[in-house]
């Protein structure tokens, strides 16, 4: 089983320099360079789930997501690479998207749950039928979440610290990240252990259950519910953007 450190070797800390950042030093942890198919935070969130499946000699992995799910994409790729069958429980009705085609190419078996069926994922007995259909498969929460997902992200703090010297830094003031479910943020808070604040920019409306999820993960990890804050960076819905944000992205890419 490939361990986290072998993937972390590809992590790069890249300092950005923009005119509008005069007086502020900003560096980005380039997790997109880790692996062509297991990139971003997805590998780190999956690493402990994969280790648990390996330890239990599970024949496969089963998880949930949408027709554009980066999580399911990484899970299917990991299953193919490490010899584990994969099953995806998808939101809505059957769709043909680039992500879905990749899932099929990686060998993932797909079940479309509709929207009502997908909402049932939070019910206590949701997994029972799927465990009966796929005995001994390791069930991975939506998005690679749970304490195992957060624990896999703890190592990111050490990766950042180990690379500060490469850009001439000896410390930093805070960690910022985009937040979907809060799993990665919880991992960073655990890893920081109060040394630096962690600020999460919400990709979805604040009404989503992110604060409750982070609080629960920190409780499970035995950590105080402190050392982080959330700011609303959403544009009316999960992952949406408006004209102002689109112009900013284009300008940043040009610069």
What are these regions (language model features)?
Residues 1-255:
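PLP-dependent amino-acid enzyme catalytic core
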């Amino acid at each position: 089983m490939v361990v986290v450190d072998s993937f972390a070797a590809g992590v790069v800390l890249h300092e950005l320099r923009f005119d509008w950042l005069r007086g502020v030093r900003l560096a980005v942890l380039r997790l997109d360079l880790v692996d062509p198919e297991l990139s971003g935070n997805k590998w780190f969130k999956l690493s402990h789930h994969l280790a648990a499946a390996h330890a239990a000699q599970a024949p496969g992995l089963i998880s949930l997501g949408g027709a554009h799910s980066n999580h399911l994409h990484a899970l299917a790729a990991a299953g193919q690479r490490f010899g584990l069958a994969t099953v995806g429980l998808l939101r809505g009705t059957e769709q043909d998207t680039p992500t879905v085609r990749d899932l099929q190419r990686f060998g993932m078996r797909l079940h479309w749950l509709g929207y009502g069926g997908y909402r049932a994922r939070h019910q206590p007995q949701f997994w029972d039928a799927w465990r009966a259909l796929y005995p001994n498969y390791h069930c991975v929460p939506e998005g690679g979440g749970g304490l195992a997902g957060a624990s896999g992200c703890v190592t990111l703090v050490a990766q950042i610290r180990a690379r500060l010297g490469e850009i001439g830094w000896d410390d930093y003031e805070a960690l910022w990240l985009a937040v979907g479910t809060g799993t990665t943020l919880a991992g960073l808070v655990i890893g920081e252990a109060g040394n630096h604040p962690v600020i999460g920019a919400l990709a979805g409306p604040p009404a989503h259950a992110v604060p409750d999820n982070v609080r629960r993960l920190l409780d499970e990890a035995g950590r105080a519910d402190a050392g982080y804050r959330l700011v609303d960076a959403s544009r009316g819905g999960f992952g949406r953007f408006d004209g102002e944000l689109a112009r900013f992205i284009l300008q940043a890419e040009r610069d």
